[in-house]
Amino acid sequence: MRPMVASIKTALLLAALSFTAAFARADTYSWTNLQSDIPGVATHADPNLVNPWGMAVPSATGPIWVSDNGAGVSTLYNQQNGTARSLIVTIPTAARNKGGGNPTGVVFNGTSFFKVTLNGNSLPGRFIFVSEDGSISGWNPGLDATHAIIAVDNGTNNGTNRAVYKGATLGVAKGHNFLYVTNFRSGQVEICDENFKRVNPTGFADPNSTGATRHSEFATLMVRFL
C-alpha cells in the first residue's frame, strides 16, 4: 500500500502546486504606460495630459474623462486601448482667476439635477468639475460641446472663504442628490444640493472640529460617498 499512499500524496502535492501557480498567475499584473504628455514615456503621447488629477467614467465601457490640471481641460480616453478621443473640453475659471483653468476633481452626473445655464437654457451638467481656483462647473453637449459652464464661483471670496477645491463625488441621502466637494483651503467637505446651493446638514459631528485639533489644521483632498 505504500506506493499507492505515496502516489496519492504526490498527486495531492502536484494539485496543490498547480492550484497555487494558477492562483499566482491570476493575481499578477503587468504595467503599461498608455498615455503621457512626455513623448516616449508611453504608448501614446498627449500634450494636454499635464498633471492629470481626477477621473470619471459614464459607464463600464464609456471613455475615461480626465481632469488635466496643468492644461485647464478635460481629455477623454478609450478604456480598451488608452487612445485619446478627439473631444477636448475647456474648463472655465473663477472670475478672479486671470490665468487658465485648473480642474482637479470630476464626477459623472447621470441625474436630471445639477443644471448649468447658458444663454437662458439650462441642462444637467453631465460631468461636474471642481477647480483649485474655487469654481465648480458642469458640461453638457446640448449647451456647449467643448466648454464646461460655471455653476459656482467661490474663488472671488476674500480671506479664508476663498475656496480651493480638490475632489468631488455625488451621493444620495434621504432621497435627494448631493454634491460633496473638498475644500483644501478650509479643511472641510462642502455639500451642495441639487441646485448647487450649499447646505449644512445636521446629524454628524466631527469630534476634532474644536479644541486642540481643529479642522483648520487639516487640508481635505479627496472624498468618496460610501
Residue ranges and their predicted role:
Residues 1-7:
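N-terminal secretory signal peptides that target proteins for export/translocation
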Residues 9-21:
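Bacterial N-terminal signal peptides
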Residues 23-226:
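Sequence/structural signature of beta-propeller domains
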